Amino acid sequence: VDKMQELSSDGGKIDIGYIFPLAGHYIPHKVRKFLDMEKNKNVVFNFWQNHTPAIEKKVRSGELDVGFGGYLHKKDDMEFFPLINQELVIVTPEDHPLGKDEVVPLSEMGNYPVIGYDRESWMGTYARHLFKKYQIKPNMIVECPDEYSIVALVRENFGIALMPRTDILAKAE
């Protein structure tokens, strides 16, 4: 927010990049609050949604003023500020054997077809890290760019998925 205040001192344009899980509520809500302040009424926003590494690249090149993404390993020339924590959940089709369980061990991901995130996404990288750390060998049947795609495939019984609890899950229930 401080960076956005600095960029918008006399109106102007702010280019921001963000990851999909922030698109449904977080980014629109924060930008609306920012624009509702009288001193910011002349600011124009350009929005760009992508994976964390792509956002990082555009922030570094100056194409984006601010980026919102998953944590990347410490980089001396970039600052990272945690804004939100999202619980990870295993998403199953309605009639799936795991669908009745309130708590499901991560190890179950090795017993069913898995719908994952694109490899270059932060969540795809993180999920692969978790699977390796806990020696889980998932049967990854497809990789998707976003939560909408993942939820749609889960609904159609393609498999189960590990994803952050986002507003798309509330709509899917």
Please provide the spans of the model-predicted regions:
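Alpha-helical linker/hinge and terminal dimerization helices associated
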Residues: 1-8
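Flexible hinge/capping segments at coil-to-helix
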Residues: 8, 75-114
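Central regulatory/effector-binding core of bacterial HTH transcription factors
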Residues: 11-75, 144
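Ligand-binding cleft/hinge of the Venus flytrap
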Residues: 31-40, 124-137
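Alpha-to-beta junction loops
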Residues: 41, 59-68, 88, 136, ...
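Alpha-helical segments flanking ligand/cofactor-binding loops in enzyme cores
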Residues: 56-57, 81, 107, 151-152
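A ligand-binding cleft/hinge motif common to bilobed small-molecule-binding domains
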Residues: 60, 70-78, 126-129, 147-173
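Secondary-structure junction motif
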Residues: 98-99, 113-134, 165
